[in-house]
């Protein structure tokens, strides 16, 4: 395991995937490599293919390659492009959505407002535009979608207006000034009563928009299911409702269940392609919460392909 990296819900993931000798597994969010390493160590001749679009993950992947040789393959790829890969027939597929601890802790990446840095927020700095540029050029509709929908921020109107007014001033260029601008847009009474930093939700929304995180999830889940062998298991870890919602709806659809209360599709027209392994999301146990507070909002869903 990479020093300082604690893979979330590891016990539970291994319990559902149940790695077997010579099994083949796909880790779509390599990150620190903790889940991948645990799979490789779980049984003889296990093989793992891992994806990550962050170039910072490559040295960690190279270290695993030195240890496990051809049993481990790393692909420099966004999981939103999973359908492009020729690989298939996996015994298990894992997603661990959201920003990684490494990305949060690397100040210069601009994911956190706790340290001043260029407001970048890209999971792959080689593609797309940094958050600072996105904020300067995004349409009103794009800003509203990011702050209101992706950030779930009730004061979205004030924040969108503040961002528009700050264009061309340099205030959107760095995390500290951006966080200050967002906080100032929120009424003082709500700022002081909040349990989280007032810029938290807006930063989340901008990050999701810059990286097309929800779009990638919606593309990746059906692609991952298609790559499962019969009897293969799909595990999905999410950290907030925006990530969990498409996973929940996809799982229910694959299991022949209504996707929501508004889903009026007759039961005889539904096709059951999988069995649910989790009736409700699995959350971290008390010992994991004590050892890794960042795991507190994690939820795990699992299904088995028929």
UniProtKB/Swiss-Prot annotation:
Keywords: Cytoplasm, Methyltransferase, rRNA processing, S-adenosyl-L-methionine, Transferase. The keyword S-adenosyl-L-methionine applies. S-adenosyl-L-methionine binds at residues 33-35, 52, 79, 96, 103. It comes from the Bacteria. GO terms for biological process: rRNA base methylation. Its main location: cytoplasm. InterPro entries: RsmH, SAM-dep_MeTrfase_MraW_recog, SAM-dependent_MTases_sf. Residues 280-306 are annotated as: Disordered. It is an enzyme of class 2 (transferase). It is found in: Cytoplasm. GO terms for cellular component: cytoplasm. Disulfide bonds: none annotated. Its EC number is 2.1.1.199. The keyword Transferase applies. It catalyses: cytidine(1402) in 16S rRNA + S-adenosyl-L-methionine = N(4)-methylcytidine(1402) in 16S rRNA + S-adenosyl-L-homocysteine + H(+). One of its GO terms (molecular function) is rRNA (cytosine-N4-)-methyltransferase activity. Belongs to the methyltransferase superfamily. RsmH family. PANTHER family: 12S RRNA N4-METHYLCYTIDINE METHYLTRANSFERASE, S-ADENOSYL-METHYLTRANSFERASE MRAW. Specifically methylates the N4 position of cytidine in position 1402 (C1402) of 16S rRNA. This is Ribosomal RNA small subunit methyltransferase H. It comes from Opitutus terrae (strain DSM 11246 / JCM 15787 / PB90-1). The lineage of its organism: Bacteria, Pseudomonadati, Verrucomicrobiota, Opitutia, Opitutales. The gene is rsmH.
């Amino acid at each position: 395991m990479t020093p300082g990296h604690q893979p979330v819900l590891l016990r539970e993931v291994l319990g559902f995937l149940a790695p077997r000798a010579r099994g083949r597994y796909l880790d779509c969010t390599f990150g620190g490599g903790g889940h991948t390493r645990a799979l490789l160590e779980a049984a003889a001749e296990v093989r793992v293919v891992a994806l990550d679009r962050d170039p910072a993950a490559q040295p960690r992947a190279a270290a695993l390659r030195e240890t496990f040789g051809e049993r481990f393959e790393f692909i420099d790829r966004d999981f939103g492009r999973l359908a492009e890969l020729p690989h298939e027939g996996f015994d298990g597929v894992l997603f661990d959505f959201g920003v990684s601890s490494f990305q949060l802790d690397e100040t210069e990446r601009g994911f956190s407002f706790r340290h001043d840095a260029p407001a970048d927020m890209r999971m792959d700095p080689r593609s797309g535009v940094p958050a600072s540029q996105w904020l300067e050029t995004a349409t009103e509709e794009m800003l509203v979608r990011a702050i209101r929908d992706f950030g779930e921020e009730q004061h979205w109107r004030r924040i969108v207006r503040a961002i528009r007014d700050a264009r061309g001033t340099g205030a959107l260029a760095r995390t500290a000034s951006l966080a200050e601008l967002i906080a100032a847009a929120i009424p003082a009474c709500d700022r002081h009563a909040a349990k989280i930093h007032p810029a938290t939700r807006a930063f989340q929304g901008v990050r999701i928009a810059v990286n097309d995180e929800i779009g990638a999830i919606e593309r990746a889940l059906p692609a991952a299911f298609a790559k499962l062998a019969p009897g293969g298991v799909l595990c999905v870890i999410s950290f907030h409702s925006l990530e969990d919602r498409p996973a929940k709806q996809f799982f229910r659809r694959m299991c022949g269940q209504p996707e929501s209360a508004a889903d009026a599709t007759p039961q005889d027209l539904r096709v059951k392609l999988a069995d649910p392994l989790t009736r409700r999301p699995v959350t971290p146990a008390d010992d994991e919460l004590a050892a890794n507070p960042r795991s507190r909002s994690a939820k795990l869903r699992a299904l088995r392909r028929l």
